[in-house]
Curated annotation (Swiss-Prot):
One of its GO terms (cellular component) is cytosol. It holds the Pfam family Cytidylate_kin. It comes from Xanthomonas campestris pv. campestris (strain ATCC 33913 / DSM 3586 / NCPPB 528 / LMG 568 / P 25). It catalyses: CMP + ATP = CDP + ADP; dCMP + ATP = dCDP + ADP. Belongs to the cytidylate kinase family. Type 1 subfamily. It is found in: Cytoplasm. GO terms for molecular function: (d)CMP kinase activity; ATP binding; CMP kinase activity; dCMP kinase activity. The lineage of its organism: Bacteria, Pseudomonadati, Pseudomonadota, Gammaproteobacteria, Lysobacterales. GO terms for biological process: nucleobase-containing small molecule interconversion; pyrimidine nucleotide metabolic process. The gene is cmk. This is Cytidylate kinase. ATP binds at G12, P13, S14, G15, A16, G17, K18, G19, T20.
Length: 226
């Protein structure tokens, strides 16, 4: 990579808090933000709109190449995502979209198709990259790497609370099973399995508030910046 802009990677399983933490840290640093999960979800949405068969890897790879995805960075408040020019932000956060994105992400050719698109986010003054393989595959040379984790029960509880606050009725045990199944898929896939980079700082977010986690991450950057 010719662009030496600093990169902070924040990886971890679904529900560990990496999205919220990454957005806040990026906003406070004034850096760009990459939500790699949103990129895979965007491809999932496009595939759903086109009624593609998830068992047809060739069609999904074409979809990954052809889908136009635009991120509207909105600071700490969140991220607006346009898929082929259409605002798909709300659809990206559906549980069904997450499951589809996880299945699509397991296809090596899709991951390869999206690799350079993700690396293109590395621009001055810096980038906070949130995902599952940011520190191991996409930005292995990143100066700052963090891996957030939490128990499956903790993560299911957070998701249950989020959905209930939005008026969505869900069963906790169903969410827990979905999270455990996704953990297994992410950890067992052949290409870029979910695991911490060897030089990543591990932070267990169980029982810790978001602001405390943000402070730890920002403190890491401060301690390693000359």
């Amino acid at each position: 990579m010719t662009d030496l802009s600093p990169v902070l990677t924040i990886d971890g399983p679904s529900g560990a808090g990496k999205g919220t933490v990454s957005r806040i840290v990026a906003a406070r640093l004034g850096w760009h933000y990459l939500d790699s999960g949103a990129l895979y979800r965007a491809v999932g949405v496009a595939a759903s709109w086109a009624d593609l068969d998830v068992s047809d890897p060739a069609a999904l790879v074409r979809c990954a190449f052809d889908t136009k995805v635009e991120f509207d960075e909105a600071g700490e408040a969140g991220l607006r995502v346009l898929v082929n020019g259409v605002d798909a932000t709300s659809e990206l956060r559906l549980e069904t979209t997450g499951a589809l994105a996880s299945a699509i992400a397991a296809i090596p050719e899709v991951r390869s198709a999206l690799k350079e698109r993700q690396r293109a986010f590395r621009q001055p003054p810096g980038l906070v990259a949130d995902g599952r393989d940011m520190g191991t595959v996409i930005f292995p040379d990143a100066a700052f790497k963090v891996f957030l984790t939490a128990s499956a029960e903790e993560r299911a509880g957070r998701r249950h609370k989020q959905l209930m606050e939005k008026g969505v009725s869900v069963i906790f045990d169903d969410l827990l099973r979905e999270i455990m199944a996704r953990d297994a898929r992410d950890a067992q896939r052949v290409v870029a399995p979910l695991r911490p980079a060897e030089d990543a700082v591990l932070i267990d977010t169980s029982g810790i508030g978001i602001e405390d986690v943000v402070q730890r991450v920002v403190g890491l950057l401060d301690s390693r910046t000359p």
